[in-house]
């Protein structure tokens, strides 16, 4: 097993304490030239990073993620926001749109079922449908969501409750900055990291999930 940042508990990089950092062979902060990291940031990246840091400090432990999302968008000068959401969270999307508009933002939104394309298009058989008794089911269309919101001139898009994999496609196709308000987790009330808090107790099954599920 290779040693990674996830296995390191020193957080020495936060203090720039090289003495407490792990060996050069495994520590990113030690074995990678700092200039290489800096060169990754173009002018727009620097603006995003700056305003993200300002937003973090200004609302630290006081503002919700929703409030921080609006603060970040405002500081960036974004005024037209897109919402890419799952139809299972239609009510939440409606509230989000209303809150954003109440704060002066223009809002566009696209639900996951936009286009009304049957799942047959991506090779799903009737037996593989969520409801096999139905003649057809409509697929989620994250590529369509992303391209539509991009075409509408959205400056920042907010992902709200897209399924695993569908969020991957959305991010892959979206042409401008994107942030996540919430992931999809039907079991954990859309709080996916709740499973991490229970991984060593009530949800210990996650440690052997692949073996138990796929053999």
Per-segment meaning from a language model:
Residues 1-80, 87-92:
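Electropositive, gly/pro-rich neighborhoods at or near active sites that engage anionic ligands
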Residues 59-63, 85-93, 115-116, 160-168:
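Gly/Ser/Thr-rich loops at beta-strand to alpha-helix junctions
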Residues 78-87, 109-113, 156-160:
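Short glycine-rich or small-residue beta-strand-to-loop segments that form or flank ligand, phosphate
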Residues 91-142:
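Long, charge-dense
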Residues 92-99, 167-176:
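Short Gly/Thr/Asp-enriched flexible loops that form oxyanion-binding sites at enzyme active sites
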Residues 106-113, 169, 173-191:
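Short, acidic/small-residue loops that bind anionic groups at enzyme active sites
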Residues 137-151, 162-164:
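Active-site glycine-rich loop that binds ribose-phosphate moieties when present
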Residues 179-215:
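C-terminal functional extensions of proteins
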């Amino acid at each position: 097993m290779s040693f990674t940042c996830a296995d390191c508990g020193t957080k020495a990089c936060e203090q720039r304490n090289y003495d407490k950092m792990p060996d050069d062979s495994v520590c990113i902060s030690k074995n990678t030239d700092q200039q290489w990291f800096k060169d990754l940031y173009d002018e727009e990246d620097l603006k995003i990073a700056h305003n993200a840091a300002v937003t973090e400090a200004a609302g630290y432990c006081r503002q919700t993620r929703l409030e921080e999302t609006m603060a970040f968008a405002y500081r960036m000068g974004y005024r037209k926001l897109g919402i890419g959401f799952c139809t299972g969270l239609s009510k939440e999307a409606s509230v989000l749109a209303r809150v954003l508009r109440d704060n002066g933002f223009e809002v566009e939104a696209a639900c996951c079922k936009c286009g009304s394309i049957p799942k047959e298009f991506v090779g799903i058989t009737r037996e593989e449908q969520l409801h096999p008794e139905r003649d057809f089911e409509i697929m989620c269309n994250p590529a369509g969501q992303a391209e539509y919101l991009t075409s509408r001139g959205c400056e920042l898009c907010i992902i709200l409750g897209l399924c695993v994999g569908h969020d991957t496609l959305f991010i892959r196709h979206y042409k401008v900055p994107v942030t996540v308000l919430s992931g999809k987790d039907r079991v954990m009330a859309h709080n996916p990291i709740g499973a991490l808090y229970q991984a060593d107790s009530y949800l210990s099954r996650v440690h052997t999930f692949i073996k138990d599920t796929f053999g």
